[in-house]
Amino acid sequence: ADAQSHGKLGLALLTDGVMPRGWHEYEWRWKCANYRPMPVLPVPLWDGGPLQGSLLLHAEQGFGDTIQFCRYAPFLARRGRPVVLECQPELLRLFARIEGIEVVPRGAATPPVVAHCPLMSVPARLGTTLDTIPSDVPYLAPDPKDARRWANRLDALGDRPRVGLVWAGNPNRINDHTRSLELSALGTLIERHDVAWISLQTGGPALQAARYAGRLHDWTGE
């Protein structure tokens, strides 16, 4: 069978809410030549069954996917499975406040575990449907001190609508050209004075914000 076709079918089914079949078709991504290989670990891949020990969930794609699917870590922990979540180092500070689990940055030593599972494979293991997607929101919370500090900073911008901008994703992603753009493409919008524009961009593309200093608030270095 054509693994790429199955993977794309999985995405199409998930877009239409056809679950759990969509999740199972999406598992074919691991057999696609252009997809990263499954991590080789000294413990077995979790099959969705009971465990006598901790389960390692590891992020496999970008920040957005990890943020969306990390909800499954506390979901499993509340059902009696000790969970260790391995995430991108940039997300460690945010995820550290998830209750009931242990969080480690990618590349660091992990506590003892008896099985592992890619984070985006958990729904397939659980047979997730639209009705059973963990929906306890919010499932992420910032540090209260940070929240107060940034609330004060944003309030100082006045009563104008406040709009955060991210114009580029990870440039190493194979289809990045379909989703990223140059900030100059938004120049006409940024010149509007009835909106407070705030850069939320990270990485190399964040340097483009300097061109709009005074119109685009850039606090990403703080």
Describe the residue ranges of each PLM region.
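Alpha-helical solenoid repeat scaffolds of the TPR/TPR-like class and their adjacent stem/linker regions
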Residues: 1-222
